Structures are given as C-alpha cells and as structure tokens.
C-alpha cells in the first residue's frame, strides 16, 4: 500500500494533523513538535490495519492512556483518516477512517476498545461500513 495522506486526531501531541506523503517525505521541526509522535501514529495505524486493535496498544509508553491527545483528558476518541492506493502503478485511491476509544479502566493485559466509526470507501462507494463494535 502507498499512503498519500494521513490524518491523525487526538493522538499524543496531535489534536488534528494532516500530512501529504510522497515517495520521499522529510519531517523537520523543533524538539517536542510531534515528529516522533507522527511515526508512533503510523505504527499504531499499521498495527490496526493488520487486524487487531489490541496489538496497537502495548505497555507504557504505547498504552491507550499514554497515546491519546495529552492536552485534554476529556477527549476520549483517537482517529485516523488515510488516503491510500495499492501502488504507484495502481493509483485508484481508497479512503479509510477509524475512530476508537478504550472502555473504562481496562486490565492492562486485556483492554477493551470501542470502535465508533470505521469505513473503507472506494470512489465514494462505501465498501465496509461499521461502528459500535466492542473489541
């Protein structure tokens, strides 16, 4: 898969950040500006895309509590919007959206998550609508 655009919501230092990606993307900024958090978000999304929300959150510093947007304890949902294609040779774009939260005070070894919105769209056609799933 080739990611064209990656939007992060309520993840670490990023309240709402969207970046355009090209074959070579350079991130430049001050210490504490969110460069490493962006890579953590990409890793988190990668684990989600492999099939298990539980894999996306391990022990601290990658626990859900440690990774949700740090400026507000009231924000509970983390989300990603991703525009991607199979490859540069197959440029048809897919749009994937997921918003989720951890439910209650979870057992660190077996947390429970709630997906509020998940969809995969191809040229405006919704391929996989979903929401309200407890995992």
Sequence positions of predicted segments:
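The conserved Walker
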Residues: 31
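Conserved lysine of the Walker
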Residues: 35
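Conserved P-loop NTP-binding catalytic core
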Residues: 39-106
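Hydrophobic anchor at the beta1->P-loop junction of P-loop NTPases
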Residues: 27
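Phosphate-binding P-loop
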Residues: 16-22
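N-terminal pre-Walker A segment at the start of P-loop NTPase domains
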Residues: 1-14
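Electropositive, glycine-dotted interaction segments
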Residues: 89-135
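Solvent-exposed residues in well-ordered beta-strands and their adjoining turns
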Residues: 9, 22, 83-85, 101-103, ...
